[in-house]
Regions:
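Glycine-rich dinucleotide-binding loop and its adjacent helix/turn
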Residues: 134-207
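FAD-site-proximal beta/loop scaffold in flavoenzymes
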Residues: 148-175, 266-270, 274-331, 343
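A Rossmann-like FAD-binding core segment of flavoenzymes
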Residues: 101-110, 118, 125, 203-294
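Beta1-alpha1 glycine-rich phosphate/pyrophosphate-binding loop at the start
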Residues: 30-102, 180, 185-225
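N-terminal secretory signal peptides and thylakoid transit peptides that target proteins
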Residues: 1-20
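Internal hydrophobic alpha-helix adjacent to the cofactor/substrate pocket in enzyme cavities
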Residues: 330-354
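C-terminal auxiliary extensions adjacent to catalytic cores
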Residues: 372-414
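Glycine-rich, N-terminal phosphate-binding loop of Rossmann-like dinucleotide-binding domains
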Residues: 13, 122, 134-135, 183, ...
Length: 414
């Protein structure tokens, strides 16, 4: 795959729905005031809130999001290496308000599917359709000692304060110190994310602390995304020791030691332990998760839950296979779901639209790799039809990623 052109991006990312614009959506006449409540203002939820309003301005949309700022997880690994500033990844929700989205910076406390309402503090919000896009929570109990140490053992897997804290720990590392990071077992948010992080930390150490090294303990048998590309990148970093099939089972902050499932004890000076993950608690408590008790099962045409009617689930909380838990996929799901919801509210058959995915991974201060995935819908399930990878790391690919992020951030929040 050569440079990602705008046309390729629109085709593969699901942005074609966005590019249609409100004026070209089907005319959906309002019979009465309907309300859609959206839980979570991330890549999926914020997109869905905006596009419900674009699809049918007669629908009242309320977005529940505790944070007053949108902080992008994509590109946050660059902050760890001093290549990017977190301020550049931080935006507000003003654009959504311009589209008529009502925003309450509060957390949803509980979902009551039988009464079609969401508890927010001491109040209730009733809905005709609910869109749940709450992201992920961590399974602290899967690593012995982690629950007690979770405030000091950083994951930095939700961009924000921990991103800055981990960056400071790396800056304070003595030259010759050891950094250990762990990769959780699949499925988890952003499959290539840990390997991008490993690349950026290795680059930082090679540049700033050449006597130091990075040990990556991967719970999976092999690199799970962009495998060949990351293997080639890892070979370029002599200070990076990659250990597959080594799951972190215990953390001892007193002795600064991680124990793996094969009995290895690994000493560290800085630890970045990314825990196993599941759908956020609000989705688990509402019994939206499937048999695995981790991820939510949905219909891939409407993203309606298979467990509860009139509730739709987006983004990282969904099982999603074969699509990855990526920001681009969540954005794509948000647009597809929004259009489906407005059709359903008006007793119309929802259109069938597959999601798309474009994912960039930086591997040094100036180079990146990328993948594009294309899908179709078969029997109301997503099926992958094509995957294209860049041939190797490239400065051009890295530069293209800036255009991609500007476009998609505007699509979500603009």
């Amino acid at each position: 795959m050569k440079n990602l052109t705008r046309r390729q991006f629109i085709k593969t990312s699901g942005l074609s729905i966005a590019m249609m614009g409100a004026s070209t959506f089907p005319s959906l006449a309002a019979e009465s005031k309907r309300r859609v409540v959206v839980i979570g203002g991330g890549w999926g939820g914020a997109t869905a809130a905006k596009y419900v309003r674009l699809s049918d301005p007669s629908v009242e949309v309320t977005l529940l999001e505790p944070s007053k700022e949108f902080i992008s997880c994509p590109f946050s690994n660059l902050v760890l290496a001093g290549v990017e500033n977190l301020k550049n990844l931080t935006m507000n929700y003003t654009g959504l308000r311009k589209h008529g989205v009502q925003i309450r910076h509060e957390a949803a406390a509980a979902i009551e599917p039988d009464k079609q309402r969401v508890r927010v503090g001491m109040d209730y919000l009733e809905y005709d359709r609910l869109i749940v896009s709450p992201g992920i929570d961590f399974q602290w109990d899967q690593v012995e000692g982690l629950a007690e140490a979770k405030d000091t053992v950083l994951h930095a897997w939700k961009a924000g304060p921990q991103t800055l804290q981990l960056a400071k720990q790396l800056q304070s590392l003595p030259d010759g110190g050891v950094v250990v990071m762990t990769v959780p077992p699949v499925a988890y948010r952003c499959p290539p994310g840990p390997y991008e992080r490993a690349s950026m930390i290795a680059w930082y150490l090679q540049t700033k602390k050449p006597k130091s090294k990075l040990i990556v303990l991967d719970a999976n048998k092999d690199i799970v995304s962009k495998t060949g590309l990351f293997k080639a990148v890892f070979k370029d970093y002599q200070n990076l020791e990659y250990r597959p099939a080594q799951k972190a089972e215990k953390i001892d902050v007193g002795s600064k030691e991680v124990t793996t499932d094969i009995g290895d004890k690994v000493k560290y000076d800085v630890i970045n332990l990314i825990p196993p993950q599941r759908a956020a608690a609000i989705a688990v408590d509402a019994e939206l998760v499937g048999a695995d008790k981790r991820w939510c099962e949905v219909d891939h045409v409407t993203y309606e839950s298979v467990k509860h009617k009139n509730i739709h689930v987006l983004g990282d909380s969904t099982i999603g296979l074969p699509v990855p838990k990526s920001g681009n996929v969540a954005n794509s799901m948000g647009k597809i779901c929004a259009l489906a919801v407005t059709h359903l509210l008006n007793s119309k058959e929802p259109p069938v639209n597959p999601p798309g995915n474009v994912c960039y991974s930086w591997v040094s201060d100036k180079e990146a790799i990328a993948v594009v995935n294309s899908y179709r819908i078969e029997n109301r399930k997503v099926v992958q039809i094509e995957q294209k990878l860049t041939p190797g790391k490239s400065v051009t690919v890295a530069q293209n990623s800036f255009g991609w992020r500007a476009n998609i951030w505007n699509d979500i929040l603009g």
